[in-house]
Curated annotation (Swiss-Prot):
The active site is at residue 65. Homodimer. Pfam families: Shikimate_DH, Shikimate_dh_N. It comes from Coxiella burnetii (strain RSA 493 / Nine Mile phase I). InterPro entries: Aminoacid_DH-like_N_sf, NAD(P)-bd_dom_sf, Shikimate_DH, Shikimate_DH-bd_N, Shikimate_DH_fam, Shikm_DH/Glu-tRNA_Rdtase. This is Shikimate dehydrogenase (NADP(+)).
């Protein structure tokens, strides 16, 4: 039986095996899907071992997305743009193909599942790490009015804005540089939720129709989403749908079939 996996560290709480099991039942495909916890300094060896043992593909989670991109022989446009990979495909000729579907998953979840319009909207992204880098391309493809990246270290936000500046109106800065305006969409892309915290955002960023979205899901997303509710945001979503939509795109890459994501999202929401 073909083998697939999610590779990360930590990986114990990954929902990807549950999602792929649901896709497996829905499409009548049979395969094994494993969780592989790779040592922080042993990612390449873990991938090689899985590949040598017949692995056909792998989802990549933290902290290995940049290393997965470097490991690949060929890469999708989205992966090249972001310099990160969210999934790998092991091809028949022995090469490794890298894709980055994080941004695709986010945009699909916002626009298709939640009916949020991104075109000609103002978007604030909180955080300038790999997660932000992975979503900027697809967000810019949606033709927003502008994107502002804010980060504790302003130079990182400025650097990201510079990389993508030819794609649309985009700027970066620190929290003290934030313009006093109300954004249509605010996306939280830091890891502070793991510590039960959220960034030092000022009041006055949220309007009556604003949408707030945390790339994390469950308890990790709670601090930011609670702040959003307290500030009066009309729409508040965590990243569970993004994860499912991302995995649906990966499933299509591996199997050539696009699964129905709605029942899977509903199933996960009922159990989380």
């Amino acid at each position: 039986m073909d083998k697939y996996a999610v590779i990360g560290n930590p990986v114990e709480h990954s929902l990807s095996p549950v999602i792929f099991q649901a896709f497996e039942k829905q499409t009548n495909h049979s395969f094994d899907y494993l969780k592989i916890k790779a040592p922080v300094n042993g990612f390449a060896a873990a991938v090689k071992k899985f590949h040598d043992e017949g692995g056909k593909g792998a989802n990549i989670t933290l902290p290995f997305k940049e290393e997965a991109y470097q490991l690949a022989d060929k890469r999708s446009q989205e992966a090249n743009e972001a310099h990160v990979a969210s999934a790998l495909q092991f091809r028949e000729d022995g090469t490794i193909y890298a894709v980055n579907y994080d941004g695709l998953g986010l945009v699909q979840d916002l626009t298709r599942n939640h009916n949020i319009t991104l075109t000609q909207k103002s978007i604030l992204i909180v955080g300038a790490g790999g997660a932000t880098r992975g979503i900027l391309g697809p967000l810019l493809n949606a033709a927003p009015e502008k994107i502002v990246i804010v980060n504790r270290t302003p130079s990182k936000a400025h650097a990201l804005a510079k990389i993508f500046h030819l794609r649309g109106e985009i700027q970066g800065g620190g929290f003290d540089e934030l313009e006093p305006m109300r954004y249509d969409v605010i996306i939280h892309a830091t890891s502070l939720g793991h510590q039960g915290k959220f960034p030092p955002l000022p009041d006055g960023l949220i309007g009556s129709q604003s949408c707030c979205y945390d790339l994390s899901y469950g308890k990790i997303a709670s601090p930011f989403l609670q702040w959003a509710k307290d500030q009066g945001a009309k729409y508040n979503f965590d990243g569970l749908g993004m994860l499912v939509e991302h995995n649906a795109a990966v499933f299509y890459l591996w199997f050539g079939i696009y699964p129905d994501t709605n029942p899977v999202i509903e199933m996960l929401q009922a159990h989380l």
